[in-house]
Amino acid sequence: MSDRLTLLRPDDWHIHLRDGAVLPHTVADVARTFGRAIIMPNLVPPVRNAQQADAYRQRILAARPATSRFEPLMVLYLTDQTTPDDIRTAKASGFVYAAKLYPAGATTNSDSGVTSIDKIFPALEAMADVGMLLLVHGEVTRGEIDVFDREKVFIDEHLRRVVERFPSLKVVFEHITTGEAVQFVNEASANVAATITAHHLLYNRNHMLVGGIRPHFYCLPILKRNTHQTALLDAATSGSGKFFLGTDSAPHAQHAKENACGCAGCYTAYAAIELYAEAFEQRNALDKLEGFASLHGPAFYGLPANQDTITLVRDEWTAPASLPFGELTVIPLRAGETLRWRLEEHA
């Protein structure tokens, strides 16, 4: 077994960078490893049009480390009021690559999200026409639906209908967490793919709930039982081009996580590819990591793969106990614990 692993530089097809004073920290962490990233638009207020996307993009570019060539790929936030013209203008911009469906109330800053899928059908039709991807947070939000069942119910009630109604629309089912989601993506057309996070590959709900509640494992969609974790590992390491890397790295300040009503999100960008390497190594599938991390995503988006490389070294190191987050701190996933792979830094 080799102690070095060289990959084409990967991309992150789902990340939250937040905004304002934290950007120099979050952008530096993602740019350290990834060539490009799909930037989530759930700011306050959300990124609803091309003009707002461009302004956010400029703030991200301004926060890059001096020598970085990291490229943010922007996303529109779909609302009940999104028009076909909004979609066409965004597509014509050249820097908006997708639009994001957040069911209203499903996750952080989703209150402005879609209240009924039918209300965005004109926008979805325009997206299919111009070749803009639909990114989906796939959970229903009705109070009577158990939080562990919300992904499966979303597939049955909404996602099947969208895929059938718009067969030419490319759809990314984001941060999938269940065996049912894996099966849906595998059985769907070539226009349907999914991202998988490192934390859903490495952990299940026992890690969050057994022996005490561990708030830094709390995310949405929530960690599921170990049988679903196994299905995700099977999918990620299968070599199928339908599955690719999306960290859903989602920082919240320490006080907002360690709270009587803590926020959902795991901060993994500081060591994302290292965490994925651990998951793939558990399956003796390090040979499949480059496809998952560096090739499948660009192919689905119709973009070229990166041409430069990164190198991972089998070398244990201790994750920081905390990281700067503007004037506050964020507790990263695996804080203070040992990681088995290290990204080789080049002078």
From Swiss-Prot:
The active site is at residue 248. Its cofactor is Zn(2+). This is Dihydroorotase. Catalyzes the reversible cyclization of carbamoyl aspartate to dihydroorotate. The gene is pyrC. It comes from Pseudomonas syringae pv. syringae (strain B728a). CDD domains: DHOase (cd01294). GO terms for biological process: 'de novo' pyrimidine nucleobase biosynthetic process; 'de novo' UMP biosynthetic process. One of its GO terms (molecular function) is dihydroorotase activity.
